Structures are given as C-alpha cells and as structure tokens.
A protein has these predicted regions:
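C-terminal beta-strand-loop-alpha-helix "lid" module of Rossmann-like NAD(P)-dependent dehydrogenases
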Residues: 1-210
C-alpha cells in the first residue's frame, strides 16, 4: 500500500525522537562487554556445546499487511526463505498479514500465537514481541534470534537487513566506533553488578531494534 507523506514524516519524527535513547542503551551494552571481557550473562549464552544442526534459530520477519508495496515485501520474504532453507530447526515470528499468508501458502509453519499486524506500530507492541522471543531464548527454546526487515535509507531508497538480536556478542565494530570518537580507554563502575545491568537493559535494546 502507498504510504502518505504525512505518515512518512510522522514515522521519521518518531524515529528521531527515540533513536538517541536506543543508541545510548546499545552503547552501554557494548561498553560493558568491551571493558569486562569475563562477564557472563544469560543473554550472552552462545551455547558452544550445542551442535550446529541442533541449534534452533528464531526469525522475526517484518512485512506489510497489504501487497501493493512491491519490493518492500518481496525482498524481505526472499531473504527469510534463503535463511530458513539453510536451517534444520527454526521458528518464524511474522509481523504483517502478507507475510503470514505467504508462508501459509508455502506450507511453512509460523508461530500461531504471534499474530501482529504491521499497522500502527507502538512501543507496547514491540515490548510484547520482545518478551516472547527473549523468554524462549532464556528457556532454551531458541538458540539464536534474528530480525529481518526493510531498512529505509531514505524516502526513496530501501534495502533488506538482518540483525542478530541474541545472543549478545562482543562486536569489535563498536570498539572501532569508540576509537573513532576518541574513546580509547575508560574506567567504568557498574552497580549493583554488570550482570544485573545487562539483565535490565538488554531486553530494552532488543525492543528498540524491533
């Protein structure tokens, strides 16, 4: 479906207002992981003893509710199919009616309880989605969680992107970014503990991505 210029401006304004908060949380996680390499946390559990063929990957696939947006939906669904074809075990969490109907026609199961439209996105809905996948990760029902979506580079340019949400990894790219900003070394003190901090802010970071 066509997106009106008013809706587009509203969406961009909302993104601009929330991005600084989200980036601050994401940077805090990166700083903790960077400065405390020995920290262990439930969200950093890569489950090294689990064989690749036994790992369960969860994919949050974000599509539209209608099919008039051309490549917007096609490219996301194509990327999702490429990923699940390489997996023995996976779960699909589909946002958007078009995506659900597509996988249904392909006889590919999706999480039935995960029934969300793409219309009127909100932080409340993002939190519910986040809680669902985070709980399954903590319970060992998922070993990795990704989100596949359309990244809007500009009002006329988009591309498909896939982000690894869980487990949290030690991303060296963030270290390079901090060095670019002139942050080479710093002392940080975390209260009550690094583990408690990560338990509190990692779900918010994941919700921010969603």
């Amino acid at each position: 479906y066509m997106i009106s210029s008013t809706k587009l401006r509203k969406a961009k304004k909302s993104l601009e207002e929330t991005e600084p908060y989200f980036n601050a949380l994401r940077n805090m996680v990166s700083r903790v992981v960077r400065h405390l390499p020995d920290v262990e946390n439930q969200y950093m559990d890569v489950r090294p003893n689990k064989a690749p063929e036994d790992r369960i990957k969860g994919f949050i696939v974000v599509t539209a509710d209608k099919g008039l947006a051309g490549a917007y939906n096609h490219n996301v669904l194509k990327k999702a199919m490429e990923e699940i074809e390489q997996c023995k075990n996976y779960k699909l969490f589909v946002v958007g009616e078009l995506g659900r109907q597509y996988f249904k026609k392909q006889n590919i199961p999706v999480a039935e309880q995960f029934h969300y439209t793409a219309q009127n996105p909100s932080l409340h809905r993002a939190r519910i989605i986040c809680e669902e996948v985070v709980e399954q990760f903590k319970e060992g029902e998922l070993d990795e969680v990704y989100v596949i979506y359309t990244y809007m580079k500009s009002s006329i340019s988009t591309e498909v992107d896939m982000i690894n949400l869980l487990p949290i990894t030690r991303d060296m790219a963030m270290q390079h970014e901090m060095e670019r900003q002139g942050v080479f070394n710093e002392e940080i003190e975390l209260q009550p503990s690094p583990n408690a901090l990560l338990n509190n802010i990692v779900p918010d970071v994941i919700m921010g991505y969603i």
